[in-house]
Amino acid sequence: MWNNNKGQVIIPTGGGKTMCMIEDAMTNMDLVKRGQTFVVVAPRILLAEQLCKEFLEIIPTNNAHILHVHSGEVEHYHTTNPKKIHLFNNVARSSGEHCIIFTTYHSLHRIQEADIEVNTIYFDEAHNSVQRNFFPATEYFSADADRCYFFTATPKHSLTIFKPGMNDPEVYGQVICNVPAPHLVEEGYILPPKVVVKELPTGDQRQSDCKNLIDTIDDNSLSKILIAARSTKQIVKLVAESDFCNQLQERGYNWMFITSKTGAIINGKKVSREEFFHTLNKWGEDETRFVVMHHSILSEGINVKGLEAVLFMRNMDYIGISQSIGRVIRLGGAEKTFGLVCVPVFDKVGIGTARSVQSVVNTVFNEGQPAISEVRR
């Protein structure tokens, strides 16, 4: 990164992208003897909060001021008002100290409107930056910031001139680092995935989902499971219109789900987002057996401890599949030697999902290449 002021850093999920950002920022602070402004961009408020926590576990705050620019409630000062952003940053800089800003792609334009000097900007899960609403601010900081880096495990390229993609070197620079997943597996940083495709009979759709998932859980003796559903509607139907939750409880499992529409639910009780993730990580570290269902909110970058397996109920693009697999290949106890990836096949979508998952695993873990998603039109 020191040899390039702009570029893409491609590292598989669990490979240490956040640590690269932190080390780069700390080195910058040590070598440049004046206050600097760092911006860290995340796709979700939840991930922005997590990144802030991880930064502050290592970076000393005696000469660094922390600002959050998004609509979430956090312990640090937070605002989306450009004038207040401008004032906060300039007060820190005028005293010769650093300003670290954590924001989301949704709110990045607010920092652009604040008209402040940004020395280094890190785009986490950078494949999100190509979205139509986010690209203008991304393009602006690519040109305006002194140093600009795009971190992702799953680049998104465009095959049409009418839509942005990370294969645009003027905005995204070149790939300056590409770490192959097999290397991380060999060195013991992440675990290899094991794909199990289970063909199941069809029937009433609601009960089919329930029975097929339960059969898959039973057959693989799983304790801590992530279920990737097709939609929030599918999760709600599974919980409300089948005996899935009763079946889980009979087997000694707790159950929980979180979506942007329904909020967080644990064993049928609505809870705060903070309690949900505290409980999820607590259960991940102890002997509690649980199933967590999600549509997309757990996919990108969120640290969830202890997950053994992901069960796909829906097809996704390469990014969604790769990110979901990434939740279960993080290191666990000595008994965890792989991350299980289960695809119950009981309709045409299931067959397509199985093929997509196999393709992603082959590309990332056998060929050692990133799973690139392509925009074709």
Can you describe what each PLM-predicted range is?
Residues 173-242:
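Conserved interdomain linker/interface between the two RecA-like ATPase lobes of SF2 helicase motors
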Residues 232-259:
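Conserved helicase motor "Helicase C" RecA-like lobe of SF1/SF2 P-loop NTPases
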Residues 128, 260-372:
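Conserved RecA-like P-loop NTPase helicase motor core
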Residues 18-20, 34-59, 73, 230-236:
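Conserved Walker A/P-loop ATP-binding site and its immediately adjacent core
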